[in-house]
Amino acid sequence: MLRVSSLFIAIASLAIAFLAAPGTGHAAGLPEGVTLEVLAEYPSKTPGVEKVLFRKITLKPGASLTLTIPAQSLCQGTKGELEVVDHTSGKTFIRKAGERWDTTPGHKVTLSNKGRVDHEHLFYTMVVKK
């Protein structure tokens, strides 16, 4: 079941907001304890969408990130739990391994790992043509 979530928005935003460090597949300029890995990039066959990015984000215990989601994403938790505070809607979500959700562009969110194990999730982001 897909659910609208700040987390998905945050991840999509994070994926686009930070450029991958050349030759590494990892994003640069992220807070300590947060990594973003580019797993694949696909050309889009959907009108108005330039490409689809497939990425993995990891937050170590105690790590957090605040951002505004720039594009829609589809996510699936693969490890640990993630707290998502959607400052735009005023809602808080807990995302667990095995859950799936989507994000809403334009929402400001804070992603936090308050657990004792790493949180990881995979996500696809639709990058709209400019």
Regions found by a protein language model. Name each.
Residues 6-21:
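Bacterial N-terminal signal peptides
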Residues 21-27:
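Sec/Tat signal peptide C-region and signal peptidase I cleavage site
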Residues 59-60, 88-107:
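Short acidic-glycine-tyrosine-enriched beta hairpin
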Residues 64-65, 81-85, 100:
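Short beta-strand segments in beta-sandwich/barrel cores
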Residues 106-130:
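Ligand-binding loop in jelly-roll beta-barrel domains
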